[in-house]
């Protein structure tokens, strides 16, 4: 399938199968457990020799890796549409999530009213709450001399920040809601509907209850007010619920992965840890590098609306393509020493937060959250390491997650 290699020797089918367990150029599958275990190696092999790979999974899809191609596909929504969803082999009956799974003018109408509620100025108001929540969680385990970072901190903090502070969801509901959102993101396709339905029902009721209360001028009120798609077409109720579900799914697990990966890196690299502890003003730049190197979105899909060619490979109208954001930011064509974490890198080019009209709406909050947490963590726990004999555990689908990280201090 792939007629798009760079200059050096392209591995044969037999060599790929021996190394990766399958021909990752012509039979790639991001749900393959072996991809989870060889994540970096597969991404780098695609970048080196096959920037447009093919998957035989289900109806099939193309896997677009190279930096410039990722930018092109992400920005050209007219050719690469979101209107049929961002996941290949979409289960029948799975509701579309607005504004992610639609095109302008629907998408742009929603982003116009939502973006102001996640602007840098607005999210800065959450900084003290993030500081307080971070220290409250650390207080629970600091005296123990160690923790399992994901269970004790990483899976909790983003939910607190988003649900409690941004949406105002009752704190008692957070554990269940965070777990359900995680399963909706990481469960196999055939099980995702169950968890999406649970989250959908909860947030549908949450919106109905909020509609009975006086307006607060927040994002929830903006969603309740809805948008006009045309002069004669208002957004229906199910679209309003869909918007809240979409933002919920995007606001939790993604931040957890970048944060956990940053903590793992600092645990294993004492020079970087000491530098950032002594220079907290440099944390913002370091967070960009962590986001570049540890992208939580493995790939997001589009449907091709016309025949095109990408990196020498013909893509037909109706074909499904996956934008491999996870690969693009480590493309050596766009980043020098791309496979190395360099917290001093300036600038830090990456597409971890996407590109084009569907660029991550919560990127400002994610940046603030990760930087603030790491600054507070280093104040309280300046020396820490990965527990000897333990090994971080990961899960990979269209998102990348870390499920276990044991650290000691």
Where are these regions (language model features)?
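Cytochrome P450
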Residues: 1-409
């Amino acid at each position: 399938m792939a007629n798009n290699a760079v200059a050096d020797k392209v591995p044969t089918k037999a060599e790929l199968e021996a190394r990766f367990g399958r021909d990752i150029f012509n039979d790639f599958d991001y749900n393959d457990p072996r991809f989870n275990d060889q994540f970096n190696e597969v991404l780098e092999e695609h970048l080196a020799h096959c920037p447009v790979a093919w998957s035989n999974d289900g109806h099939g899809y193309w896997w677009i890796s190279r930096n410039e191609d990722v930018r092109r596909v992400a920005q050209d929504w007219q050719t690469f549409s979101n209107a049929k969803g961002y996941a290949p082999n979409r289960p029948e009956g799975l509701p579309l999530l607005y504004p992610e799974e639609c095109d302008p003018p629907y998408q742009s109408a929603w982003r116009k009213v939502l973006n102001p509620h996640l602007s840098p100025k607005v999210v800065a108001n959450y900084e003290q709450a993030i500081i307080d929540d971070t220290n409250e969680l650390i207080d629970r385990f600091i005296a123990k001399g160690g923790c399992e970072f994901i269970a004790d901190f990483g899976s909790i903090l983003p939910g607190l920040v988003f649900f409690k502070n941004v949406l105002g969801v009752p704190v008692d509901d957070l554990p269940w809601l965070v777990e359900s959102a995680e399963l909706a993101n990481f469960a196999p396709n055939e099980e995702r509907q169950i968890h999406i339905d649970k989250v959908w029902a909860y947030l549908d009721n949450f919106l109905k209850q909020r509609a009975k209360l006086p307006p607060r001028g927040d994002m929830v009120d903006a969603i309740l007010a809805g948008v006009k798609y045309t002069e004669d077409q208002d957004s229906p109720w199910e679209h309003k619920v869909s918007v809240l579900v979409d933002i919920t799914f995007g606001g939790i697990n993604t931040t957890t992965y970048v944060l956990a990966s940053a903590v793992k890196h600092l645990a294993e690299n004492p020079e970087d840890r000491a530098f950032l502890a002594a220079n907290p003003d440099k944390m913002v730049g370091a967070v960009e590098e962590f986001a570049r190197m540890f992208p939580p979105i493995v790939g997001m899909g589009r449907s091709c609306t016309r025949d095109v060619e990408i990196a020498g490979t013909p893509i037909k109208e109706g074909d499904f393509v996956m934008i491999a954001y996870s690969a693009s930011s480590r493309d050596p064509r766009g980043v020098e020493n791309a496979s190395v974490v360099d917290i001093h890198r300036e600038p830090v080019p990456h597409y971890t937060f996407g590109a084009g009209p569907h660029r991550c709406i919560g990127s400002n909050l994610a940046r603030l959250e990760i930087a603030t947490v790491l600054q507070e963590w280093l104040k309280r726990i300046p020396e820490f390491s990965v527990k000897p004999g333990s090994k971080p555990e990961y899960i990979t689908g269209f998102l990348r997650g870390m499920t276990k990280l044991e650290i000691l201090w």
